[in-house]
Regions:
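Catalytic core of non-heme Fe(II) oxygenases with the double-stranded beta-helix
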Residues: 29-37, 45-208
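Non-heme Fe(II)-dependent double-stranded beta-helix
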Residues: 1-40
Length: 211
């Protein structure tokens, strides 16, 4: 198989292939390229604006006319626009035991939205790998790169890693999420990571880092 920048293969680790590279890759089918083109387009972003408009108004205090438009939206690592989108192929490698891909955390503060399209193999009978959402028990508290300790949050919901399932959320200072531990498996955890981000940060979690 073609090595797409992966030089150090590790167990239960995420590896990504972004839209800018995939769209120029002759080994990627036209079907997938069309999928990527649509999910990095302003048309898709505009649909998300409409779906989440009330939440956007509540969290960010702006209406749709103040959000990025077709003229200033581009593809990340390709266009360097005011607002950049991406649609990444992502795999989490097989695991030999109960391990977690990532604990509760916040995404990049530049990110405005994220959509996870799960592509679980039909033959994959392993457990875990589900998306979790969380709420702080008290005041926000982070360590490292926007990580959150398990004892600082309560579980809100567990969204099963399932074939053809799409999970979408707005990124905010309270959008804490993680992934449940995966049991031993030879299967990859596969999904498309669809995001939109600004060139600037939307919030700052650093004042809440552990001292």
């Amino acid at each position: 198989k073609k090595n797409r920048g992966i030089n150090d293969y590790k167990e239960n680790t995420a590896y990504r292939y972004d839209a800018a590279n995939a769209l120029g890759d002759i080994e990627i089918s036209d079907t997938w390229k069309n999928f990527i083109k649509y999910h990095t387009s302003y048309e898709f972003t505009s649909e998300l604006y409409d779906i989440f408009l009330e939440s956007i108004k509540q969290i960010y205090k702006v209406d749709k006319d103040k959000l990025p438009n077709k003229n200033n939206t581009g593809v990340r690592f390709k266009d360097n626009a005011f607002f950049n989108t991406d649609c990444q192929f992502v795999i989490n490698t097989p695991t030999s035991g109960d391990t977690s891909v990532i604990e509760p955390h916040l995404d990049n503060p530049k990110e405005f939205y994220a959509a996870l399209f799960y592509m679980r193999d039909k033959e994959d009978t392993s457990t875990g790998g589900s998306l979790t959402t969380h709420k702080f028990i008290g005041e926000p508290s982070f360590y490292g790169k926007a990580r959150v300790r398990e004892e600082k949050v309560n579980l809100i919901e567990e969204i099963e890693y399932k074939e053809n399932r799409l999970a979408v959320f707005l990124n905010s200072p309270l959008s804490i999420h993680g992934v449940t531990k995966r049991s031993k498996t030879d299967f990859y955890r596969k999904y498309m990571n669809i995001i939109g981000e600004f060139n600037n940060e939307l919030f700052d979690f650093r004042p809440f880092l552990e001292k």
